[in-house]
Amino acid sequence: MSDYIVVKCGGSMLDQLNDVFFDCIKKLQQKYKVVIVHGGGPEIDAKLKDCNIKVEKRDGLRVTPREVMDIVQMVLCGSTNKKLVMNLQKHNLLAVGCSGCDGNLLQVQPVSKEIGYVGEVSYVETALLKGLINMNYIPVIAPIGINENEIYNINADNAAAGIAAALSAKELIFITDVDGILHEGKLVKKTDEFEIDTFIEKGVITGGMIPKVQAALASLKMGVQKVSVVNGTKDFAEVTGECIGTTVTKGVNIV
């Protein structure tokens, strides 16, 4: 069984992370080898508005022409990545920040010409991640990738799923500001790919949770053992290394 865990933290969560989150990362690190992938959407939006550049998304993906890609790269690889690295180290968690173009870490296939420099993960150079982890660092990855010497923006959920699949990770953890997937106000503690599809069809899962569960299902199909959706502002990791939230597994129909 793989002992890797990938933690995905969206850009909207980065400013909400508190001591509890970092304590949970410490608990996970005692049991597993941890990789963190982050987003940066709100800061990118703010910087684009400062530059009088239109913020545009299609099907949940940021339309990324060259001038937008330059700002995406600046934010994700610069201030956002380094802020998270410094916060980890402030809590005595040694971390190294890098992007998917460093060491050819994340190679991508372009999604479509219509949305510009946006790619989906096609290959992960896991040797770089494993090398950093073996030196007791937590890799902190900005979701930028490369294709034919061009830099591409990657949806952070897709980047995390791709990395988790390449590592055959034990678990992919999505950090959110809710306790997990909720149905009629109650937490769904365990679910699977069949029930997830039903939840989407019935409108139980909406908005920003949809790309997360879609990435979760994709990573399960690629070999990740389970996916958890947790509240990053609460204690989501037990001392056993198990997560408190919604756990999604493959092919166990519990409906």
Swiss-Prot record:
GO cellular component: cytoplasm
Residue sites binding substrate per the record: G40, G41, R62, N153
UniProt-recorded Gene Ontology molecular function terms: acetylglutamate kinase activity; ATP binding
Top enzyme class: transferase
Main location as per UniProt: cytoplasm
GO biological process, one term: L-arginine biosynthetic process
HAMAP family registered for this protein in UniProt: ArgB
Membership in a protein family: Belongs to the acetylglutamate kinase family. ArgB subfamily.
Name of the protein this chain belongs to: Acetylglutamate kinase
Protein species of origin: Bacillus mycoides (strain KBAB4)
